[in-house]
Amino acid sequence: MEISERVRARLAVLSGHLSEGKQDSPAIERWCTSADTSVAPLGSLKGTLTIVDERTGKNYKVPVSDDGTVKAVDFKKIVTGKEDKGLKLYDPGYLNTAPVRSSISYIDGDEGILRYRGYPIEEMAENSTFLEVAYLLMYGNLPSESQLSDWEFAVSQHSAVPQGVLDIIQSMPHDAHPMGVLVSAMSALSIFHPDANPALRGQDIYDSKQVRDKQIIRIIGKAPTIAAAAYLRMAGRPPVLPSGNLPYADNFLYMLDSLGNRSYKPNPRLARVLDILFILHAEHEMNCSTAAARHLASSGVDVYTAVAGAVGALYGPLHGGANEAVLKMLSEIGTVENIPEFIEGVKNRKRKMSGFGHRVYKNYDPRAKVIKNLADEVFSIVGKDPLIEVAVALEKAALSDDYFVKRKLYPNVDFYSGLIYRAMGFPPEFFTVLFAIPRMAGYLSHWKESLDDPDTKIMRPQQVYTGVWLRHYTPVRERIVTDDSKESDKLGQVATSNASRRRLAGSSV
C-alpha cells in the first residue's frame, strides 16, 4: 500500500526533529501558506503637508502617504542654516511613532476593536483554538484542515526541551521567579540550537523559509514545556515530559498536574478556558515587548535571543504585571461596601485603580468582555472567588461615574484575568508567564514579518542631547569639589554587612 503524501510529510517533520541537522523538513513549507497581503481600503489620506518655518520664512512640503503617515526623515531637511542638523521628532514612549508597517493585527482604541489578520478577536475566541490562531498570525490566513493537522503535529513533535535547558532550570533556586526562569531558558535555547544562529551560520540563514518555520515551531512547542518546568521548580518537583496526544492547552495543564501519571487528563472545560485566554493574549501589535523583539531582531540576532529579550520586557510590572496588581487592589477593597470610599480615593488621587484604562483603548477592551464571560465557566468547576463580586460592583460603579466616563477609563484585559488565573490555582507570580506563552505567537509573527519587510533596518533611535556642551580633562588631584555638586553625581553609600565587618576586622599572615 502506497504511503500518502500527508503521511510522508509527517514523517519528514519527525525526521527533521530527531536529526536536528542542517537540513530542515520540506513538509513545513509545503503545508504552510503565505499571507494574503490585500488590505481593505479605508479611504486614501494621501496628500502633502505644507510647513511654514517661522524661524526662516521658508516653506516645506512633506508627502503624506495613503495611510496618513509622514516619514520622520523628511523633517531633517528643515534647517536654519548650514550648521543645523535638521529637525528631530521628540516622542518619549513612542506615543505617536510608527517604526514599522504591519499586517498582523489591527486596533481601533476609540471603538474598542481588535482584529487578528482582519478577524475580530471575539470571533476567534468563540470559534478557534490557540494553535489555529498562531498559524493565522504567522502565515496570514486560516489553515485548511490538512494544514492545521500538520501544524499541530509539528508543534507537538517539537515540544520536548533539551535536557541541558531543563538542567539549567533545575539548578535555579526554588523561589526563582518563573519569568526569570523563562527568560533564562529561552535564551539558553540559542546555545542548544546553533544551527539557527546568524552569528554562527551567516546572516542569510533566515532567508530560508524552512529554517524560519523550524524555529517558529520549536518556540511555540517548547514555550509551555519551559513554563511548566518553571512552575514545577517552584513546587520542588521535577519537570514532566509533554504528551504527544493532547491539545496545546491540555498538554500544558497535563505537565503541571499529572505528577508523571501518563494516563492523567486535565478537565477539558478548564483547558478550553485557558486556550481562549491564550487566544486573547496572542498578539497586540507594537506593545513594549513586541517592539523589543523587533528592535533586537533588527540587529540580526538569533530568534531565541530576540524572544528572550521580549519576555524580559514583559517581566516589567508596567507591562506584564497588571493583573497581579488588580488582585492586590481588590483584596485591599475587601467588600462591596468599601467601593464608594475607594472610588472617592481614586478621584482624589489618594488611591490607584488597576485594571482600568489602556494606552491604546479609550473604550471597553474587547478582550475584557470575553474574559468576563469566562469567569462563570471557571467558577462553576472550581468554586466562586469572593472577589468577583467586588470586581463586578467596582466596574459598575466606575462606569456609572462621570469621572471615569469622561476620562474614557474602561476595564482592560487584566481586570478579570487575574481572578480567573487565581481560581484555576495559579499563584500570582505565574500570571505573567501565562501571558508570555501565547504572546510567543505575536513575537514570532513580527519577527517573521520583519525578515520580509524591505524597509527593515537596524533600529537606532536619535536622542536630544541635554548635557554639558564641552569641557576638558582635569587631572584627579586638580579637581575641585564644590558644595553645589549635584546629589546625583555622588556615589551612593553601600551599607556594609556585619559579615563584611567581621572579615575586615581579621588579618592575614
UniProtKB/Swiss-Prot annotation:
UniProt keyword Repeat, yes or no: no
Catalytic activity, reaction form: oxaloacetate + acetyl-CoA + H2O = citrate + CoA + H(+)
PROSITE patterns: CITRATE_SYNTHASE
This protein's pathway: Carbohydrate metabolism; tricarboxylic acid cycle; isocitrate from oxaloacetate: step 1/2
Span list, region Disordered: 485-509
Record-annotated active site: 319, 358, 414
GO molecular function, one term: citrate (Si)-synthase activity
Bias kind Basic residues: ranges: 500-509
Keyword Transferase carried by entry: yes
A GO BP entry: fatty acid beta-oxidation
TM annotation in the entry: none
Major enzyme class: transferase
Key words of the record: Peroxisome, Transferase, Transit peptide, Tricarboxylic acid cycle
GO CC annotation terms, alphabetical: cytosol; peroxisome
Assigned EC number: 2.3.3.16
Tissues showing expression: Widely expressed. Expressed throughout the shoot. Expressed in flower, silique, stem, cauline leaf, young leaf, mature leaf and senescent leaf.
Any matching Pfam family: Citrate_synt
Subcellular location per the Swiss-Prot or TrEMBL entry: Peroxisome
Protein family: Belongs to the citrate synthase family.
Remaining remarks: Citrate synthase is found in nearly all cells capable of oxidative metabolism.
Descriptive protein name: Citrate synthase 3, peroxisomal
Species for this entry: Arabidopsis thaliana (Mouse-ear cress)
Source organism phylogeny: Eukaryota, Viridiplantae, Streptophyta, Embryophyta, Tracheophyta
